Amino acid sequence: MWKKPAFIDLRLGLEVTLYISNR
């Protein structure tokens, strides 16, 4: 079982990357 915080961190990082790329 992987930790949820890690999943949230990865998801947040991905969203931030997409946001910056979309700018």
Swiss-Prot record:
Task: Please provide the record's keywords in A-Z order.
Answer: PQQ biosynthesis
One protein family per Pfam: PqqA
Residues in cross-link Pyrroloquinoline quinone (Glu-Tyr): E15-Y19
Checking HAMAP family in the record gives:
PQQ_syn_PqqA
Q: Know the name of this protein?
A: Coenzyme PQQ synthesis protein A
Q: Is Nucleotide-binding set as a keyword in this record?
A: no
**GO BP terms in the entry:** pyrroloquinoline quinone biosynthetic process
Checking NCBIfam families in the record gives: PQQ_syn_pqqA
What protein family is recorded? Belongs to the PqqA family.
Q: What does this protein do?
A: Required for coenzyme pyrroloquinoline quinone (PQQ) biosynthesis. PQQ is probably formed by cross-linking a specific glutamate to a specific tyrosine residue and excising these residues from the peptide.
- What pathway, per the record? Cofactor biosynthesis; pyrroloquinoline quinone biosynthesis
